[in-house]
């Protein structure tokens, strides 16, 4: 019996497999960066970590480590933004709680061995010619801040005040994630959670009184 394979289906399958393999490498890079930092992450080590041939890794990322790191940071930033946006649909308090819980789960579930890959790249001393990962980190922070700002504005906050509050949230969360790793404890995140929620409530109700 002769099986005829439709050319478009075959190409679609190959494209899907390629995208899947590439996506795994990007996710693997994000995981390595959040554990080791950018300077300690090489394309060769990533290939071993992801159990991928070194040649295919360079094929997917001809720009080398800089391209891979940039895409990994974008991937991590988008992942967090997607969760945050979904929960913010229920309101700024719910979004804040989910954002905090997401990072708490990251540090606790990894035994405090992993943090935020966006922060890890943001604090690296990168050559000016290799600044794309840092730019991706800035974009991720900006997107999270904008999502929080828009949600608070939609619930009654004045925009300038909402922007300040959103910046405080992102800065506090990122800093406390680093503290959690250093102290091997989730207490820093728990402490800021207790402080941030009433501040957000005050921000969204201030203009209603």
Protein language model annotation of sequence segments:
Residues 106, 124, 170-187, 201-206:
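Amphipathic C-terminal alpha-helical segment
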Residues 1-20, 206-209:
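N-terminal intrinsically disordered/low-complexity leader segments
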Residues 78, 101-149:
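Short secondary-structure transition hinges
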Residues 24, 28, 32-71:
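Helix-turn-helix
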Residues 128-130, 141-166, 202-209:
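Hydrophobic alpha-helical bundle segments that form small-molecule/ligand-binding pockets
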Residues 119-120, 159-179, 191, 195-199:
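Hydrophobic alpha-helical segments that form the core
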Residues 73-79:
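Short, basic, alpha-helical segments at the C-terminal edge of helix-turn-helix-like DNA-binding modules
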Residues 83-115, 165-169:
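Hydrophobic alpha-helical connector segments
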């Amino acid at each position: 019996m002769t099986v005829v394979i439709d050319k478009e289906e075959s190409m679609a399958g190959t494209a899907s497999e390629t995208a899947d393999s590439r996506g795994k490498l990007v996710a693997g890079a994000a995981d390595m960066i959040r554990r080791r930092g950018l300077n300690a992450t090489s394309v060769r080590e990533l290939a071993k970590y992801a159990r991928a041939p070194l040649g295919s890794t360079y094929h997917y990322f001809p720009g080398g480590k800089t391209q891979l790191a940039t895409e990994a940071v974008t991937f991590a930033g988008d992942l967090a933004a997607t969760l945050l946006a979904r929960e913010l649909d229920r309101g700024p308090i719910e979004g804040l709680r989910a954002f905090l819980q997401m990072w708490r789960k990251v540090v606790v579930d990894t035994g405090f061995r992993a943090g935020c890959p966006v922060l890890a790249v943001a604090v690296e001393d990168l050559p000016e010619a290799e600044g794309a990962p840092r730019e991706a980190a800035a974009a991720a922070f900006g997107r999270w801040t904008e999502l929080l700002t828009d949600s608070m504005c939609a619930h009654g906050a004045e925009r300038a005040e909402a922007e300040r509050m959103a910046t405080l949230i992102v800065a506090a969360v990122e800093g406390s994630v680093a503290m959690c790793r250093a102290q091997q404890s989730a207490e820093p995140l728990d402490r800021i959670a207790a402080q941030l929620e009433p501040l957000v409530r005050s921000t969204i109700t201030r203009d209603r009184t």
